[in-house]
Curated annotation (Swiss-Prot):
Intramembrane sections: 752-768, 969-983, 1078-1096
Protein name per the record: Transient receptor potential cation channel subfamily M member 2
Principal location class: membrane
Modified residues (Phosphothreonine): 739
CDD domains: NUDIX_ADPRase_Nudt9
Membrane-crossing residue ranges in chain numbering: 794-814, 826-846, 866-886, 895-915, 928-948, 1021-1042
Subunit text: Homotetramer.
Domain Nudix hydrolase: 1351-1502
Pfam families on file: Ion_trans (PF00520), LSDAT_euk (PF18139), TRPM2 (PF25508)
Binding residues annotated for Ca(2+), in chain numbering: 841, 844, 867, 1071
Regulation of its function: Activated by intracellular ADP-ribose, beta-NAD (NAD(+)) and similar compounds, and by oxidative stress caused by reactive oxygen or nitrogen species. Ca(2+) and PI(4,5)P2 are required for channel opening by ADP-ribose. Activation by ADP-ribose and beta-NAD is strongly increased by moderate heat (35 to 40 degrees Celsius). Likewise, reactive oxygen species lower the threshold for activation by moderate heat (37 degrees Celsius). Activated by moderate heat (35 to 40 degrees Celsius).
Protein source organism: Rattus norvegicus
Region (Disordered): 1-24
Domain commentary: Contains two binding sites for ADP-ribose, one in the N-terminal part of the channel and the other in the C-terminal nudix hydrolase domain. Both sites seem to have a role in channel opening, but the interaction of ADP-ribose with the N-terminal site is absolutely required for channel activation.
Length: 1507
């Protein structure tokens, strides 16, 4: 067998990643290397060149911290270089050595030793690397010593190279020579590898050279870079190569750093060296001072990967250790050694089947039982996949391969075979993530911790598909509270599919949402979020208000409520009231740092702190929905809205918030997305309301006006109006409700003519001429019917119309007929009438049923255009009245009042918006008015330009301003409508109609004329030309443009006119719904009554229940439950409609076809497997028949029937030579491997001793194994009196008596008499691959005692806990600080002693005798051989396991035991030997040594307990 160092050199032309051996030096965690803000790292990505300052820092830091290796002693080697030159033992030529090495005075005459003659010096190769002629891509590189600390390398990569801490480490290993892969498999591998790296933020580590698997990885990254955008980020590919094997490495040497270093990829001239791959982003070039020696980087790569995997990465709000996975393509012996080391150290491996050689050999046998993986089978596979080099394999190598492959396959939980198109694996990324989850599941953790770790991985990588299939299974039942931290992480990182998954698996939002949770969510808003900046503004304003406060105000929920009120409108109340001092939230953050760094807070600790914290929220679903909406998270908001109860109001509120945010959003794309999402939520509100209205009109209309406590005591209708959701308001059900309100208690079937007749002759009300909606009104007294009629808004409206028309007629009469110096009675009546209008407008201004305050009501009042018009008309009337009452200004007063009459007439437009015919037309007119204003700007340009030019050409020095205005503006404007000026040319030129000097104020100044004054002096051709051009553009072009604008506006508005009219109709209905029934001026009586109620009686204002109704709790709960039920119907209908879409049907059909193909493939595989099983069964039957025939023949021969010569030779052969493969298979099926496993691990624990490989079939001593030559190892013990002598011969051991009790030492085996060969006892379980006694104390059996101390696990009430009906046990275990596993408190015993030494260390001495009594009274659960990694061919461990169970928690002996457990010992702690004891739950995942687990399982079985 080859030594370990030799096998490492065999990987010269292979890429392998080294996995650290189990005894490698432990490395501590890096302090403060994890940066909290990844955005700082992203600004320093690999494609960005260093600034001069950074280059200087790097040029000073690297030489101080990173070294290279140089040979300092030239010793001529017997070998020549490839060029035939003399080289040193290090491989470099004479010229490549430093001057000190050529003249070494210190080492003269000594043999070359790399440990002595290779020294470290500051590195001279680092910086940026650019590959000449290939691309402008800039990478990073560094040359460093093989002894460089992993901490330093990690610091270089993360702090100086600017790499983000990875979420995953992918180590790709395999063939270093170029090999062929099927195109489809190559494409799948490249796509999957880059996909998993890009989606998880992984680092890919390879050998970095431009050959083999490294080249495949580089090309995969190249293809991704060419096809992706800059936003998708970069794939970090790190090549770790040997400096001495790199071709053209001289180009990389720059003592002050290469910025950049130009490297040429020269494959033709590389010879036995290799070139760096141009598609890698970073290179770590490991230097040991030699040239041409491959594999130098493996130890450093091993340590670096191990170190990185021990770091903690926090992503998506969860903290996990950086997982590592090994991906294998092709490969040879070195790759096999790499896989073996990886599996041994617990690193999961993904084998790509179809890539060739080692990968295919392992993939072919991975599904077989270990007992079926024989030497002959491996030999057969090698002959198939290693055809060219199969003849070079020695028998020892084949045996070693068999043993390693058996050990690899034995740990199936770490082995994943990727097969193209099989096992549901569509891509390599799925296989990689499944491998990590499978490995995580196999770790020795208690159930919750293990599954929690798997879920962290899935959330961090955003792989909900794997979480569904691998984590949320029947194997583990999740508690909703366990999912809360992951739920928060999924929300913060915007992973809606995970939120949906958690909700499906029992997370209740009422329990999830607490004060702490909400604060955590709002503190983690993205800085780019508009709501984030609004919060900052609120906090800054509060800080300015509290000028005396030295500390910056901290974020609290009432700050959020302030911003939300701005968005929802002041008609809503604050959603989160300002807390009292004692209610101040525990999580808070200063204003400049609202963005909470998730890496700084443990979500698990957050939920531990908030356990039992009473939620303050009315509706937790609302809180999460608002949080999702303000960030414009579409899918997340949709999922949360589906959980809401008050869903119609929620959808309308979301629409309002989004529309308000879109107005302030500067990013156009984000603004459009917000508007689209607002429309989507409006459609959802319409959909739910439609379902409700179809089911029950009355209850649906109750939903519209129900006061929603959750949304600031507003109503659905009010939210829709605030959000201007015209589609919702124009819904038939809402319009029916508004019509119902409009008609009051009257039936809507009453014709308008009936209403008018009753208004003119109200006694008709007593005849049944008018029908009422409620039958009871039909039978009520006349006064009640009159009150119901005149309180109807429709009646109030028409009474006000009649009153208003009367007012306008009277006003016109006074202005035109009866406007006397002293006001007449008619004019006084107008004054009274106007006073009543003023009183009504004042009532509307101060009407505040919701308690919003005067300022807010004034703001709302003046936001309406018609109110502004009313106030303007009233103020103008007061101005005109003031002038009219002053005799000197009587006429100006009449003019003002005349203009005011126009404004009062315009008010009619608002009145007629209720009309279905006139209302839409009024809307169109309003929109066209906007077009006119834009048109006037264009028209003014032509009018002013032509008017000024014309006036300047025709008239000289006109000084009268009024005539300048007429000439420039007025005449030019009239010209558009056909009034062409006569003096523009000389045909109609006349001086009679003008004033020559401009002295006549009623005549224009004459144009320029000749000296006679009879002919024009201006150029007629010019003025005519200007006139024609002006008419062409102004009269034809601009007027037609205006017509086109009107036409476009008409068509655009006409499509939505009905919606707009229905939306605006509400305002008029609401106005007259709350208006006093009497029309002006009789309305003064109503105002007097109102004044008495408000001022004298102090009765507050109340809103009519028809528009805002606060329901009783029971009624509201029933109504919301009904709405929730119908919302589910709506969602189901939406889902059904989605499935019925053609594109969705095509996708479903495609998926079904793919599933069918997979099923057919699986069926074919099953049929093939079934055929093999049937053949095997047939073989077994034939063998049994042969044995039976042989028995018959033997019996007949013994009975004297024939000689038996030559009879049934087939049966005899079947009996004598049974099928070996069938026998092995049967044995494997019956008892697994059937042999010890841990005792055959190649690397012996606590020593760098490699065992001789022993495959399963060669374990029994009876099996012939001619090449078996195990090494001899016996460790020296400090106390030689307690161990057998050391020696590899039998002479020192001649005095030992085996198979008997030798003095105080019991050398008898529980398995009977064992064989002693050449003075050494032989392990009764077979070969182990190592002779001697190893680290054990005695040759032969080493007897141990394992006391299993158990008690029942009890809850707080004292009851026994159960799991899956079975009771749960707790066991007493111990642990050394250096150990990763716990152990039973037993072990080896000193000769003649009963208690193990380990047990004595944890028990106080006065309790030893009592515990011995407990042991004698205990139950023996196991006695026999222990499969321990310390076992050898000549020494092994046998144990007796005794169960000591305490049935009662109040057992006196149990209490005494707990009292006598050893306490903290400072001396032992200083030596690192202090043991810790703990009661742990008995479970199959308990982190216990494997052989102790088997014992514990027997104890659990003894008591019928859970395991």
């Amino acid at each position: 067998m080859e030594p370990l160092d030799q096998r490492r050199t065999d990987s010269d032309q292979e890429e392998g990643f080294g996995v650290q051996s189990r005894r490698a030096t432990d490395l501590g965690m890096v302090p403060n290397l994890r940066r909290s803000n990844s955005s700082l790292c992203k600004s320093r990505r690999l494609l960005c060149s260093f600034s001069s300052e950074k280059q200087e820092n790097l040029s000073s830091w690297i030489p101080e911290n990173i070294k290279k290796k140089e040979c300092v002693y030239f010793v001529e080697s017997s070998k020549l270089s490839d060029a035939g030159k003399v080289v040193c033992e290090c491989g470099y030529t004479h010229e490549q050595h430093i001057e000190v090495a050529i003249k070494p005075h210190t080492f003269q005459g000594k043999e070359w030793d790399p440990k002595k003659h290779v020294h470290e010096m500051p590195t001279d190769a680092f910086g940026d690397i650019v590959f000449t002629g290939l691309s402008q891509k800039v990478g990073k590189y560094v040359r460093l010593s093989q002894d460089t600390s992993s901490i330093v390398i990690y610091q270089l990569m993360t702090q100086h190279w600017g790499l983000d801490v990875p979420s995953l480490l992918i180590s790709v290993t395999g063939g270093a020579k170029n090999f062929n892969m099927k195109l489809r498999l190559k494409s799948i591998f490249r796509r999957g590898l880059v996909k998993v790296a890009q989606t998880t933020g992984a680092w890919i580590i390879t050998g970095g050279s431009h050959t083999g698997v490294m080249k495949q990885v580089g090309e995969a990254v190249r293809d991704f870079s060419l096809s992706s955008s800059c936003k998708e980020g970069d794939v970090i590919t790190i090549g770790i190569a040997t400096w001495g094997t790199i071709h053209n490495r001289e180009a990389l040497i720059h003592p002050m750093g290469g910025f950049p270093a130009e490297y040429m990829l020269d494959e033709e001239g590389q010879g036995n060296l290799t070139c760096l791959d141009s598609n890698h982003s970073h290179f770590i070039l490991v230097d040991d001072g030699t040239h041409g020696q491959y594999g130098v980087e493996i130890p450093l790569r091993t340590k670096l990967e191990k170190f990185i995997s021990e770091q903690t990465k926090e992503r998506g709000g969860v903290a996990i250790k950086i997982p590592i996975v090994c991906v294998v393509l092709e490969g040879g012996p070195g790759t096999l050694h790499t896989i073996y080391n990886a599996i041994t150290n617990g690193t999961p491996c993904v084998i790509v089947e179809g890539s060739g050689r080692v990968a295919d050999v392992i993939a072919q046998v991975a599904a077989l039982p270990v007992s079926e993986i024989t030497i002959s089978l491996i030999q057969q596979k090698l002959s198939v996949f290693f055809q060219e080099m199969f003849e070079t394999f020695t028998e020892n190598q084949i045996v070693e391969w068999t043993k390693k492959i058996q050990d690899i396959v034995r740990r199936r939980q770490l082995l994943t075979v990727f097969r193209e198109g099989k096992d549901g694996q569509q891509d390599v990324d799925v296989a990689i993530l499944q491998a990590l989850l499978k490995a995580s599941r196999s770790q020795d953790h208690f159930g919750h911790e293990n599954w929690d770790h798997q879920l962290k991985l899935a959330v961090a990588w955003n792989r909900v598909d794997i979480a569904r299939s691998e984590i949320f299974t029947d194997e583990w039942q999740w508690k909703p509270s366990d999912l809360h931290p992951m739920m928060t992480a999924a929300l913060i990182s915007n992973k809606p599919e995970f939120v949906r998954l958690f909700l499906e698996n029992g997370v209740r939002l009422k329990e999830f949402v607490t004060w702490d949770t909400l604060l955590c969510l709002y503190e983690n808003l993205e800085p780019s979020c508009l709501f984030h900046s609004k919060l900052q503004k609120v906090l800054a304003e509060e800080h300015e208000r509290l000028a005396y406060a030295s500390e910056t105000p901290r974020l609290q929920m009432h700050h959020v409520a302030q911003v939300l009120r701005e968005l929802l409108g002041d008609s809503t109340q604050l959603l989160y009231p300002r807390p009292r001092y004692t209610d101040r939230p525990r999580l808070s953050l200063p204003m400049p740092h609202i963005k909470l760094n998730v890496q700084g807070v443990s979500l698990r600790s957050l939920y531990k702190r908030s356990t039992g914290h009473v939620t303050f929220t009315i509706d937790p679903v609302r809180d999460l929905l608002i949080w999702a909406i303000i960030q414009n998270h579409r899918e997340l908001a949709g999922i949360i809205w589906a959980q809401s109860q008050d869903c119609t109001a929620a959808a309308l509120a979301c629409s309002k918030i989004l529309k308000e945010l879109s107005k302030e959003e500067e990013d156009t794309d984000s603004s459009e997305e917000m508007l689209a999402l607002a429309d989507e939520f409006e459609h959802r509100a319409i959909g739910v309301f439609t379902e409700c209205y179809r089911k029950d009109e009355e209850r649906a209309q109750k939903l519209l006006v129900r006061v929603s406590e959750a949304w600031g005591k507003t109503t659905c209708l009010q939210l829709a109006l605030e959000a201007k959701d015209m589609k919702f308001v124009s819904h038939g059900g809402i319009q029916a409700f508004l019509t119902k309100v409009w008609w009051g208690q009257l039936c809507v079937d009453n014709g308008l003519w009936r209403i008018i007749l009753c208004m003119l002759a109200f006694p008709l009300l007593f005849t049944g001429f008018i029908s009422f909606r409620e039958k009871r009104l039909q039978a009520l007294c006349r006064l009640a019917r009159v009150r119901a009629f005149f309180n109807a808004p429709v009646v109030i409206f028409y009474l006000n119309i009649l009153s208003y028309f009367a007012f306008l007629c009277l006003f016109a009469y006074v202005l035109m007929v009866d406007f006397q110096p002293s006001p007449s009675w008619c004019e006084y009546l107008i004054y009274l009438w106007l006073f009543s209008l003023v009183c009504e407008e004042t009532r509307q201004l101060f009407y505040d049923p919701d308690g919003c305050g005067l300022m807010k009501m004034a703001s709302l009042y003046f936001s309406d255009f018609w109110n502004k018009l009313d106030v303007g008309a009233i103020l103008l009337f007061i101005a005109g009245l003031t002038c009219r009452l002053i005799p000197a200004t009587l006429y100006p007063g009449r003019i003002i009042l005349s203009l005011d009459f126009i404004m009062f007439c315009l008010r009619l437009m608002h009145i007629f918006t209720i009309s279905k015919t006139l209302g839409p037309k009024i809307i169109i007119v309003k929109r066209m008015m906007k077009d006119v204003f834009f048109f006037l700007f264009l028209l003014a340009v032509w009018v002013v330009s032509f008017g000024v030019a014309k006036q300047a050409i025709l008239i000289h020095n006109e000084s009268r301003v009024d005539w300048i205005f007429r000439g420039v503006i007025y005449h030019s404007y009239l010209t558009i409508f056909g009034q062409i000026p006569t003096y523009i040319d000389g045909v109609n030129f006349s001086m009679d109609q003008c004033s020559p000097n401009g002295t006549d104020p009623y005549k224009p100044k004459c144009p320029e004329s000749d000296w006679t004054g009879q002919a024009p002096a201006f150029p007629e051709w010019l003025t005519v030309t200007l006139l024609c051009l002006y008419l062409l553009f102004a009269n034809i072009l601009l007027l037609n443009l205006l017509i086109a604008m009107f036409n476009y506006t008409f068509q655009e508005v006409q499509e939505h006119t009905d919606q707009i009219w229905k939306f605006q109709r509400h305002d008029l209905i609401e106005e007259y719904h709350g208006r006093p029934p009497a029309p002006p001026p009789l309305i003064l009586l109503s105002h007097l009554q109102l004044l008495i109620k408000r001022i004298v009686l102090k009765i507050p204002a109340k809103r009519h229940k028809q528009l805002k109704n606060k329901l009783e709790k029971n009624e509201e709960a029933a109504l919301l439950s009904w709405e929730l039920y119908l919302k589910e119907n709506y969602l189901q209908n939406q889902q059904y409609q989605h499935k019925q879409r053609p594109e969705q049907k095509i996708q479903d059909i495609s998926e079904k076809v793919d599933t069918m193909v997979d099923l057919l493939d699986m069926d074919r595989v099953k049929r093939s497997g079934s055929t093999e099983q049937r053949l095997a069964s047939l073989e077994e039957q034939v063998t049994q028949m042969g044995r039976s025939l042989h028995w018959i023949v033997t019996t007949l021969k013994d009975s004297g029937f024939g000689s038996g010569a030559g009879a049934l030779t087939l049966a005899q052969r079947a009996f004598d030579e049974p099928d070996a493969e069938l026998s092995i298979r049967k044995k494997g099926e019956e008892g697994g491997d059937g042999y010890h496993v841990s005792a055959r691990h190649l690397l012996y624990p606590d020593a760098r001793i490699m065992r001789f490989p022993v495959p399963n079939e060669k374990v029994p001593w009876e099996a012939e194994f001619l090449i078996y030559d195990p090494p001899f190892y016996t460790a020296e013990k400090k106390d030689a009196t307690l161990t057998d002598p050391v020696g590899d011969t039998a002479e020192p051991l001649s005095k030992i008596n085996y198979n008997v009790v030798d003095g105080l030492m019991d050398r008898c085996s529980f398995h009977g008499t064992y064989v002693v060969q050449y003075g050494f006892p032989l392990n009764p379980m077979g070969r182990t691959g190592l002779r001697g006694r190893g680290s054990l104390s005695w040759f032969g059996p080493n007897h141990t005692l394992q006391p299993v101390v158990t008690r029942w696990k009890r809850n707080q009430g004292g009851g026994i806990c159960r799991k899956s009906v079975r009771k749960m046990l707790e066991v007493l275990v111990v642990k050394l600080p250096q150990s990763e596993h716990w152990a039973l408190p037993g072990g080896s015993r000193e000769p003649g002693k009963m208690l193990p030494r380990k047990l004595k260390q944890v028990l106080q001495q006065e309790y030893w005798v009592t515990f011995e009594t407990l042991l004698r009274q205990g139950t023996e659960v196991y006695k026999g051989y222990v499969d321990d990694p310390r076992n050898t061919d000549n020494a092994w461990i046998e144990t007796v396991a005794v169960s000591i169970h305490f049935q009662d928690q109040n057992d006196v002996e149990l209490k005494r035991l707990e009292e006598n457990l050893q306490t903290h010992d400072p001396k032992e702690s200083a030596r690192g030997l202090e043991m810790s004891t703990e009661w742990q739950v008995v479970d199959r995942r308990i982190p216990l040594y494997v052989n102790h687990k088997k014992i514990l399982q027997k104890v659990a079985s003894l008591f019928g307990a859970h395991f």
